[in-house]
């Protein structure tokens, strides 16, 4: 195990029938919303904890219900290099999402918007959504969090910086 990595991983190996496509697309969207690392075709991974294990168990049940096959595995990387590559893949995916959120927050701060409070609420919701699937926070997380919450001061809303020291 590498410092700052998971140690144990939950792997989901799955196959979903091509037809009908609706269940396959729903499963793909669910996996995407969980922030999985794509290891190969039909093989995804998440760092192991009770929450991620349960989430992948639910996806496996959805795969079975769609007429496919799914197997859950608990694995430990034998190579520190391979584990770091997987962690980096997850970090880069979340960093891209945080950068997008940061850009939107900066644009909102620069533009005179009449309904800034509603947009701020949406940005906060998006930030929470990204953080739920962020297992190895990149530096962009803190920047996006600060940008979103600094808007609160300009809208008159209370500033709620999650995870910041009191």
Predicted regions and their residues:
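Glycine-rich, aromatic-bearing surface loops/beta-hairpins
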Residues: 126-166
């Amino acid at each position: 195990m590498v410092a700052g990595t998971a140690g144990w991983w939950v792997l989901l190996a799955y196959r979903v029938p091509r037809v009908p496509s609706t269940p396959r697309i729903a499963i793909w969207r669910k996996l995407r919303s969980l922030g999985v690392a794509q290891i190969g075709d039909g093989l995804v991974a998440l760092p192991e904890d009770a929450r991620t294990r349960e989430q992948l168990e639910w996806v496996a049940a959805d795969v079975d219900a769609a007429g496919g096959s799914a197997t859950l595995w608990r694995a430990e990387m034998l190579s520190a290099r391979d584990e770091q590559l997987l962690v980096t893949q997850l970090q880069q995916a979340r960093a891209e999402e945080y950068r997008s959120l940061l850009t939107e927050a900066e644009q909102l701060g620069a533009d005179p918007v009449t309904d800034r409070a509603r947009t701020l609420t949406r940005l906060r919701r998006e930030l929470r959504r990204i953080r739920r699937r962020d297992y190895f926070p990149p530096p962009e997380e803190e920047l996006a969090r600060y940008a979103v919450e600094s808007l609160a001061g300009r809208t008159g809303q209370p500033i709620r910086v999650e995870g910041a020291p009191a």
